[in-house]
């Protein structure tokens, strides 16, 4: 039997595929903009026949119909990175958050630490050789498919066929659900003056020929805009966005000087506009790989002049970075921040950067704080932080004492909060005992 016959034998409608899920199964579900939406709704429709199905996933772009309150008891969520679709469920205790570095998620599956019976993933249609591309999200999906007993492929004719280490052979698939639905789009934001200032300062740390890790949002967009005069930049990142596409088209990103995968944009997922999804379709410039490769710090470090640009919710005056919670309330997750911070630190000429606005809540709350809020999780330790960038400047923390760090971070805090930060450091005796606020460092 050739692959086409096997593929056709496994075609079924979405309701039949949903019946392959049993009570008490652990089910991996692909996430981000690749969430297999028809299966989510089909599972919701048969919720009354299911009990305690564990759904294991990262964030979903758009709604999660299985996170509704009336789904409790039928489905329970284990979330590896929290997004808006599941944040309320996590904060209310209806879903569980699992802290993990992005590079380690595939190993959770392969090692058997989290056995998976069913994997549900979105793919592009098969190519002429019978391989299904995972399209806009490779991340942990390939590992889940490798270990699952049942693999359900939601084959979306509107999914781009991406290249790299992101293919599933048709014979590995238990069920094929053919469909056509638009991927969620996240168009680029318009950076504010604050974000533009941050972007310009970050860009000053980027040399020609550097390799970048960029995310999505106003800060990375502002960084890319500020890099217009740079030459031969490369990309090794978690995520590809519209701004990466724009920088390729403008000639800023060529990958010509990359020391690992020269000429290639290496990533594990893509998120942006339909124009981006069309751009990466069958484009050999892009190489999509699983997160245990893209986010492996030792792989990242093989890129010389690696510049990692990550954000934070708050940074304390010693350099501890909180990026997953607002106090005790989980907001997002570890993601790949520390993967890239450490990878860039090990890279020859690497530059690990934490970039954030100096304030939140319309300027009423400082994001450079004396201490992280009670319950806040530290994602990047103070021993790992090299640069903290705000619209007020660049704090260089590498090789600095706590006393010196206070000075560096005060200088990039909003002026309205510097005196309070100084007083707190003095009261905690981080600044010298002979020092009193307003005198300067003794």
Residues covered by each model-derived region:
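Conserved alpha/beta enzyme-core scaffold
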Residues: 1-442
């Amino acid at each position: 039997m050739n692959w086409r016959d096997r593929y056709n034998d496994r075609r079924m409608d979405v309701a039949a595929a949903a019946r392959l899920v049993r009570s008490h199964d652990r089910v991996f579900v692909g996430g981000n903009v690749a969430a297999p939406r028809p299966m989510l709704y089909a599972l919701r429709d048969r919720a009354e026949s299911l009990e305690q199905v564990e759904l294991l996933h990262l964030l979903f772009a758009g709604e999660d119909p299985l996170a509704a309150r009336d789904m409790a008891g039928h489905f329970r969520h284990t979330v590896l990175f929290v997004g808006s679709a599941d944040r309320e469920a996590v904060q209310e205790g209806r879903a569980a958050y699992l802290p993990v570095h992005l590079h380690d998620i595939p190993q959770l599956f392969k090692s058997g630490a989290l056995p998976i019976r069913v994997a549900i993933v979105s793919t592009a249609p098969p190519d002429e050789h019978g391989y299904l591309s995972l399209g806009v999200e490779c991340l942990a999906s390939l590992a889940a498919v490798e270990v699952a007993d049942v693999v359900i492929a939601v084959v979306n004719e509107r999914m781009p066929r991406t290249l790299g280490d992101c293919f599933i052979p048709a014979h590995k698939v238990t069920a094929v659900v053919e469909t056509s639905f638009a991927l969620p789009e996240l168009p680029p934001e318009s950076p504010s003056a604050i974000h533009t200032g941050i972007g310009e300062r970050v860009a000053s740390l980027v040399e020609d020929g550097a390799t970048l890790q960029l995310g999505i949002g106003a800060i990375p967009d502002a960084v890319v805009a500020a890099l217009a005069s740079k030459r031969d930049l490369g990309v090794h990142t978690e995520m590809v966005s519209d701004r990466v596409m724009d920088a390729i088209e403008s000639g800023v990103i060529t990958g010509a000087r990359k020391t690992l995968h020269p000429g290639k944009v290496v990533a594990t997922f893509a998120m942006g506009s339909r124009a981006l999804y069309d751009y990466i379709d069958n484009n050999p410039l892009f190489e999509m790989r699983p997160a245990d490769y893209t986010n492996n710090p030792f792989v990242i470090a093989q890129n010389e002049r690696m510049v990692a640009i990550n954000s934070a919710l708050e940074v304390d005056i010693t350099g501890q970075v909180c990026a997953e919670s607002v106090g005790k309330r989980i907001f997002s997750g570890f993601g790949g921040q520390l993967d890239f911070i450490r990878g860039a630190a090990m890279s020859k000429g690497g530059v690990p950067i934490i970039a954030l606005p100096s304030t939140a809540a319309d300027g009423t709350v400082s994001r450079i704080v004396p201490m992280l809020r009670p319950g806040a999780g530290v994602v990047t330790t103070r021993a790992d932080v090299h640069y903290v960038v705000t619209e007020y400047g660049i704090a260089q923390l590498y090789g600095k004492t706590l006393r010196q760090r206070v000075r560096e971070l005060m200088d990039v805090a909003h002026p309205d909060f510097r005196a309070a930060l100084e007083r707190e450091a003095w009261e905690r005796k981080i600044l010298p005992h002979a020092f009193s606020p307003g005198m300067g460092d003794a």
